[in-house]
Structures are given as structure tokens and as C-alpha cells.
């Protein structure tokens, strides 16, 4: 059975109630590829608003940009899995490079958050990727494997069915630089091989591996043709009308 194409829009720390409502209403009214799963991730303040607008047409799901690994307590500024459940938010992004680099989140901490989310019934867009220095040192596969291994220590084999892996080379995020189709496919194929060896052949066959890093309406169609590219995690372009073209990359 073919893997369902997946496109996520990470709004990051952008948007207002008005602009986020407009973006989702535009998606509600647009002609979208019905075979593509679409998820948008607004800032936490607007999650319930986004959910209400998305519920009007049920074409788009909503994701948090982050979640904490503890169930509740004195963790100022954090969001718990149970709070996402209560707000009926089905997805969360975990491990984005901006949190790894700026907020110093470790592989182990990120893995605990992935486990907490999945244990609580929240599906995860699990971000991994290397820096420019690591790529130039030919350590890309070593780095992403280390990030994956941390999660593998926390999850059961069955729980990988709730994970979408987002390969996002750090050097391509927000820079305008994009991994070539060959570079993206090489890493995606290595991740799929890791899934087969470390988790199970079923996980390798069924887990969606998406690409992120300056994805635009100009490069999405070529990337979407690659065998192991199952979709995209889109940053800045998800705030623009061109997001529809990226969702429809396989039409």
C-alpha cells in the first residue's frame, strides 16, 4: 500500500488571529490534492482558533509546534500532552532544529518528548538533520542515525506508526539553500534503511519520511518525484498562497 503524501506547514513564531484564520480559510476553499494529508502548525496561542477554522471543512489538521515531556506541573511556558488532548490537537512537531540549536534541546530530551506525545495519543512530526559543518565533514548519516537511535530507545516498534520523520538539513532552513533532489533522496533512503534494520521491515515500508528546508512552489515537484520523499515540512512558504501549490506537488 503506497504511503500517503504528507505536507505540514510550520508557521513558527509568525501570524495573527486574522492572518492565521485567512490562511486556513484559503486552504478550506482551495482545490487540494485529496490524497495528500495536510497539517498546519500555528503558534500555541492560536491552536484552538486554527482548530475551529479547520473544523469547518475537515480538510486540514492542526499541530502544535512543541510539547513537554512531563504531564503537568511547574514548567512555565510549556504545554503538556494532556493539554493538547483537551484542545483536540492531534499532532505536534518535536525536535525542530531551531529548538535543538537555539534552546539547546538534546537528542535524549527530544526522544522523551516523542514518547510522551505518542503515549498520550498525539502523532509526531519528528525533525532530524545535520548542520553545514556536519555535512561538510561527511557526517550526515551518522548525525541523523544518532538522532533516530535516541528515539528508538524510547519507542516500541508499533509506536513508529504514529511518527512522520522530517529530514531537515539545518543549513537549508530559512536560508534559501535547498538540498538537491539527489542529496534529499540519499538521506531519505538511508533513513528508510535504518528503519528496516533498527525497527522493522514494516516500519520501513510504512513510515513517511518528509523533507524540509526552503521548500517552495519552485522546487517541490522535482523533490516529490523521489522514491523516498513522502512529502514536505514547509516553513515560510506555508504562510503564502503558494502553499497550495506545494500541497498539490504530485498533481
UniProtKB/Swiss-Prot annotation:
Gene Ontology, cellular component aspect: cytosol
PROSITE patterns: TIM_1, TIM_2
EC number: 5.3.1.1
Pathway info: Carbohydrate biosynthesis; gluconeogenesis; Carbohydrate degradation; glycolysis; D-glyceraldehyde 3-phosphate from glycerone phosphate: step 1/1
CDD domains: TIM (cd00311)
GO molecular function (one): triose-phosphate isomerase activity
Catalyzed reaction equations: D-glyceraldehyde 3-phosphate = dihydroxyacetone phosphate
Alphabetical UniProt keywords: Gluconeogenesis, Glycolysis, Isomerase
Annotated binding of substrate, by residue: 10, 12
Enzyme class: isomerase
Pfam families reported in the protein's UniProt record: TIM
Assembly with partners or alone: Homodimer.
UniProt protein name: Triosephosphate isomerase
Amino acid at each position: 500500500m503506497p504511503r500517503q503524501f504528507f505536507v505540514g506547514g510550520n508557521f513558527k513564531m509568525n501570524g495573527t488571529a486574522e492572518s492565521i484564520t485567512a490562511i486556513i480559510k484559503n486552504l478550506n476553499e482551495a482545490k487540494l490534492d485529496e490524497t495528500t494529508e495536510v497539517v498546519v502548525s500555528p503558534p500555541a496561542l492560536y491552536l484552538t482558533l486554527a482548530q475551529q477554522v479547520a473544523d469547518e471543512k475537515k480538510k486540514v489538521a492542526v499541530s502544535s509546534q512543541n510539547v513537554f515531556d512531563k504531564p503537568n506541573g511547574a514548567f512555565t511556558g510549556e504545554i503538556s500532552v494532556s493539554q493538547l488532548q483537551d484542545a483536540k490537537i492531534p499532532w505536534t512537531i518535536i525536535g525542530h532544529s531551531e529548538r535543538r540549536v537555539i534552546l539547546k534541546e538534546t537528542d535524549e530530551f527530544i526522544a522523551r518528548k516523542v514518547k510522551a506525545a505518542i503515549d498520550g495519543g498525539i502523532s509526531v512530526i519528528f525533525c532530524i538533520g545535520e548542520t553545514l559543518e556536519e555535512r561538510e565533514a561527511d557526517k550526515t548519516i551518522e548525525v541523523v542515525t544518532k538522532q533516530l537511535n535516541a528515539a528508538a530507545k524510547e519507542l516500541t516498534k508499533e509506536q513508529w506508526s504514529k511518527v512522520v520523520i522530517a529530514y531537515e538539513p539545518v543549513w537549508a532552513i530559512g536560508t534559501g539553500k535547498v538540498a538537491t533532489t539527489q542529496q534529499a533522496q540519499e538521506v531519505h533512503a538511508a533513513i528508510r534503511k535504518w528503519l528496516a534494520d533498527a525497527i522493522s521491515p514494516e516500519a520501513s515500508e510504512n513510515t513517511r519520511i518528509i523533507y524540509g528546508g526552503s521548500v517552495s512552489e519552485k522546487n517541490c515537484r522535482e523533490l516529490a518525484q523521489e522514491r523516498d520523499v513522502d512529502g514536505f515540512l514547509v516553513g515560510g512558504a506555508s504562510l503564502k498562497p503558494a502553499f497550495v501549490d506545494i500541497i498539490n506537488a504530485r498533481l
